[in-house]
């Protein structure tokens, strides 16, 4: 780095960022009230007050693994451990309803649909409510592509059925 000579003084990184032992001249030192930086004030002032500029403070986390408060459940408890986990999930309000029982007389298409999608059990009243709600939904004209306006619902259902059958007939790429 080249030094620039101004008035006999050299200007380099050591003059821009002086160390604490260097004596600053009256023209180079910080003036009163010019900023937050001062080489004489330690940064521990905020720690003494307990709060930073926005009222937040730094609290170091415990680094000692021996003093952890959380007890980890031993692995291999079997059924008792699973029940304990279920109790914790219910206590936290994260309980999900039990999955529907699988019946052996389901057709393959229904089983494939249930296994490929997450299923929400709905009673017939809820199904009708969803149908009525969706019937009232209308998309704006720019949101519907031209091909969708030109095909009837019956034709579209036929296209979807053929696509589903073709997907089931082809080998799965897993």
From Swiss-Prot:
Its biological purpose: May play an important role in spermatogenesis and/or testis development.
Sorted UniProt keywords: Developmental protein, Differentiation, Phosphoprotein, Spermatogenesis
Residue(s) carrying Phosphoserine: 103
Region (Disordered): 1-83, 95-123
Record keyword Nucleotide-binding present: no
GO CC, one annotated term: cytoplasm
Tissue specificity statement from the Swiss-Prot or TrEMBL entry: Highly expressed in testis. Transcripts can be found in primary and secondary spermatocytes, and spermatids, but the protein itself is only detected in spermatids. No expression in Leydig cells, spermatogonia, or sperm. Very weak expression in the heart, kidney, spleen, thymus and ovary.
GO BP terms in the entry: cell differentiation; spermatogenesis
Acidic residues compositional bias, start-end: 38-48, 65-82, 101-110
Pfam family name, one: MEA1
Protein name (Swiss-Prot/TrEMBL): Male-enhanced antigen 1
Source taxon at top rank: Eukaryota
């Amino acid at each position: 780095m080249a030094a620039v000579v101004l008035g006999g003084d050299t200007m380099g990184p050591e003059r821009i960022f002086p160390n604490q032992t260097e004596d600053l001249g009256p023209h180079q030192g910080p003036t009163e009230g010019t900023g937050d930086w001062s080489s004489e004030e330690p940064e521990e002032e905020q720690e003494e007050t307990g709060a930073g500029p926005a009222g937040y403070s730094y609290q170091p986390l415990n680094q000692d693994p021996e003093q952890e408060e959380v007890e980890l459940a031993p692995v291999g408890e079997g059924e008792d451990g699973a029940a304990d986990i279920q109790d914790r999930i219910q206590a936290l309000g994260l309980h999900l309803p039990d999955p529907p029982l699988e019946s052996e007389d389901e057709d393959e298409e229904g089983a494939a649909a249930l296994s490929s999608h997450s299923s929400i059990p709905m009673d017939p009243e809820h199904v009708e409510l969803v149908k009525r709600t969706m019937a009232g939904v209308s998309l704006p004209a720019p949101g519907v592509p031209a091909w969708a306006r030109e095909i009837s619902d019956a034709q579209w259902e036929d296209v979807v059925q053929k696509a589903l059958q073709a997907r089931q007939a082809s080998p799965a790429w897993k």
